[in-house]
């Protein structure tokens, strides 16, 4: 049985990112494996023994609530430290970092990603695409990554985190916008997402795993403890 943790869908479920858990479940079932989704709502403890965890996007207040809960509970941190895969989208990426800006203040993050997020004046909205860096646990990715971004965050990665992709379209992490008060939409944009240990995070909505089946299968393989090449192809 593959047990998929859908983390805080009541506060980090604004943009349909719950669909990532559905994609994982369906792609497992299509290969003949039993799989179930376990929603974990605000105020509930995060079980640390599930096979994989997904987090979605949300607005400022929701982010703060999510960060406070995940920090105080500690279950997701223990799961990630044990090597269980975690996949986070947009606000989820920011919440898992060291800090992020929300509601006019700097908020402590969970600390699973060496990343800090500042605010931008102009919202990044539109298609985003990148070539995988193949960093860390994403070494087997070969296909371009695509999604839809909608965020005001500019994220800088520290030395312990690596980008998921190198941008070919869109804003992605808008990493250079985090270093200055920039309103220019043409500010340098270099990277998309983050990879650190068992955590993969991205600004791609879509849902991301529906648009990027190879990434979905990579996460599925990690959750099942097998190599990506060992998963049977889906016709």
What do these predicted regions represent?
Residues 54-55, 88, 202:
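Redox-cofactor binding/interface segments in oxidoreductases and associated redox assembly factors
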Residues 186-224:
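A glycine-centered loop/beta-turn motif at secondary-structure junctions
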């Amino acid at each position: 049985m593959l047990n998929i943790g859908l983390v805080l869908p009541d506060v980090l479920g604004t943009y349909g990112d719950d669909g990532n858990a559905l994609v994982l479940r369906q792609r497992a079932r299509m290969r003949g494996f039993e799989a179930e989704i376990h929603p974990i709502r605000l105020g509930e403890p995060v079980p640390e023994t599930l096979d994989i965890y997904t987090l979605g996007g949300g607005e400022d207040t929701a982010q703060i609530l999510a960060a406070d809960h995940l920090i105080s509970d500690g279950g997701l941190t223990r799961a990630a430290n044990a090597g269980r895969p975690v996949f986070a989208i947009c606000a989820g990426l920011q919440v898992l970092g060291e800090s992020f800006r929300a509601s006019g203040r700097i908020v402590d993050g969970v600390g699973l990603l060496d990343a800090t997020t500042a605010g931008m004046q102009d919202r990044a909205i539109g298609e985003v695409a990148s070539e995988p860096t193949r960093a860390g646990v994403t070494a087997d990715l070969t296909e371009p990554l695509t999604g839809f971004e909608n965020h005001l965050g500019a994220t800088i990665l520290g030395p312990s985190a690596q980008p998921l992709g190198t941008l070919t379209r869109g804003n992605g992490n808008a990493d250079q916008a985090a270093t200055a008060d920039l309103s220019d939409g043409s500010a340098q944009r270099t990277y998309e997402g983050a990879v650190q240990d068992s955590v993969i995070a991205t600004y791609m909505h879509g849902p991301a795993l529906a648009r990027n089946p190879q990434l979905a299968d990579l996460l599925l393989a990690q959750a099942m403890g097998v190599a990506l090449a060992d998963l049977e192809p889906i016709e």
